[in-house]
Amino acid sequence: NPSGKLPDTFANSFADYPSSAHFFDSFFEVKYYEDIYVGYRYFETIPDAYDKVCYPFGFGLSYTTFDIAYKGVTEKEKGFTFEVAVKNTGAVAGKEVVQIYFNAPDGKLGKAKMSLVSFGKTKLLAPGEEEILTLDVEKYYMASYDDFGKVAKSAYILEKGDYTFYVGNSVRCNKEAFVYTLNEDKIVKQLEERCIPRLLEKRLTSDGSFEDVPTFEGPLYNYPSFPTIKQVFNGKETDKKYMLSDVAEGKVTAEDFVTQLSLEQLKSIVGGQPNAGVSNTFGIGNVEEFGIPNMLTADGPAGIRIKPKHNVLTTCWPCSTLQAATFNTPLVEECAEIGATEAEENNMAIWLAPGMNIHRTPMCGRNFEYYSEDPYLTGKTASAFIRGTQKRNVAATPKHFCCNNKEFDRMFCNSILSERALREIYLKGFEIAVYDSNPRCLMTSYNIMNEERAAENSSLITGILRGEWGYDGLVMTDWHNRGRHNREVKAGSDVKMPEGLPRQLGDDVDALRAAALNIVKLALYFE
């Protein structure tokens, strides 16, 4: 009995999606005029868009019927816990997905009329059987980002007013369950302005009109300085040479360990390393003198891809979009663990998965690698995949960070969007994954984003990913990107794949050691 739900909105035609109007305007740039109104957020909010939907987000069929009943809610410091009873009222056993949406007050900041904020799936229910699901909602994921300063500039805020929650099994099949009233505006998280566009003249608002966008006229590629790692060994021969195993045993710190590496070794380690065994996507690390292994990679996410003609078979899993359609995170986690087991069996340390960009348009050539048009579903599904992968001795690598929504001329296309859309839609899934599952690796995207290459963007990598989210894992580039290696290292990227460009690297030892330190920390993960 099928129990999946649509992770995307199926409109009547391609022209009905807001992204279609300007998708083919230019080979070299795409302007995200629709802003936060992506997928169902557009069709449920914008006037005259409602009737353009053929099948709504969250819709799914079953051979049985279910009664979904809201039972109550408990408010907690950081959110709410809902209890929902689901009863099989038909004649066939089946599973049902409960989806919780909320409607925020359309105050100074425009809001989508419906936003997914929690979901859960029942076990297989026999006819007449009932199950009570407990679903958590986090207030942080209800907040809107104020890039204009209408309430509090550069902050996630909850505007005063009524927040109405709906419980059901799709964005259009639900009932009002609970109203939370906020008597005054609340700053949920104060941040800094980052990744501001320079070339975006307008964006869509909730009433279907357009407004100006905050833009930036400052310098490109404004790189931070890295903290100096105290020189201990000067990269020279000493009476005592420390190995990676000594770091694992606590005999020396990782920071002191990397100071043994010469400038030439630092320039080498920040690039990809040769293939070995059945790997065909190269390795990371590989400084034999100090016991740093060559950590081999395997492409994904639909299974472990290895070098052909080696008579080694691996499982081909359903594509990411189908996995998201299960709305079943324990199942996704289980599948990922099995896939990671195959990686482990073939001496692969790093699985280049999951893919988790947003389905902004049906025309994106890699939508099959990505989960959904919705950032919350994307983030929670990816988190499950990462947890499953890292249950084994394998590092997950969520990708492509970020705004990779067009394959044609993907190396040079500039995704131009507001900071609000970037944070609420295109980064939110990655943020959830970092907070929920702590992936050991992360891959940047090919594209340019607001006039800076993703892999060279210090505001994105050092500012948001590492600074705001506290990410301490390894950041690698996508394969054969067109970024300059020296800029990538200065931006906070650790490894250029599949190989480095040492001639582009100068003698910024602090930046090189910072990258090497993250590579060493990854190697320690496998010790």
Where are the regions that the model predicts?
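Short beta-strand elements
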Residues: 173-192
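Glycoside hydrolase catalytic-domain context in secreted enzymes
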Residues: 1-173, 193-527
